[in-house]
Amino acid sequence: MLVASLTLPVKTFAEFIAYAKANPGKLNFASAGVGTAPHLAAELFLSVAQLNLTHVPYNGSSAQAIRALIAGDVAMFMVGTSTALPFIKNGNVRALAVTSTISRVDGLPDVPTFAEAGLPQVDYSLWFAIAVPSATPTDIVKKLNADINKIVADPQYQDALKIRGFEAKGSTSDELAAFMEKDYLKNRALILKLRLHVD
């Protein structure tokens, strides 16, 4: 999710784009460190939108980056919805767009997706999975997978996650492996394109 500092004279995604284009190299953006998901998501957005902002990494800490955004030390931050939601709801930061190309966030119905805002290429999501050691017997893996998918499909569980900005999807082990490979290749290509190096 793209969130902006309230110190900027913008209220919408389009206004942010126009302001950033009118001030090339004068704005900056926060991340939780070089190569982190917020950094890669921001670089993808800036590349697609053809914007020039300076990266300010806060080593491994979204909390530091959010504080800098609230203070006006940085102009924008690409952050997970669940992290940003309380600060948006409290009026500390401004939500401009959601990185999902699928749907808006239930708790923020007025915030467009990047696709709706005209940049469908900005498709970057944080995700979580449950894994077991590779030596785990197949029958145990199948049992765990079935039980977890049952929980994930429960409407009450789905609703509890949606309120917090999450979307839960079940899968098979093979589907998860294929998804992880695709995500790895996407991130690898972005890292190589940007010539990122982790210190």
Protein language model regions, located:
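Hinge/capping helix and adjacent helix->loop/strand transition within the periplasmic-binding protein
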Residues: M1-Q64, V111-F114, W127-A160
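Conserved functional loop/turn residues at catalytic and ligand-binding sites
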Residues: T12, G72-D73, G80, N92, ...
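Alpha-to-beta junction loops
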Residues: N23-L27, L51, I70-V79, N92-A95, ...
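Short helices/loops that flank or line small-molecule/ion binding pockets
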Residues: L44, V48, A63-F77, S82-N90, ...
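An extracytoplasmic/periplasmic, membrane-proximal ligand-sensing/linker region
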Residues: L51, K89, T138-D199
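Short beta-strand and adjacent tight-turn residues that come in two discontinuous sequence segments
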Residues: Y58, M78-V79, V98, Y124
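C-terminal lobe and pocket-closing loops
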Residues: A84-V152, L185
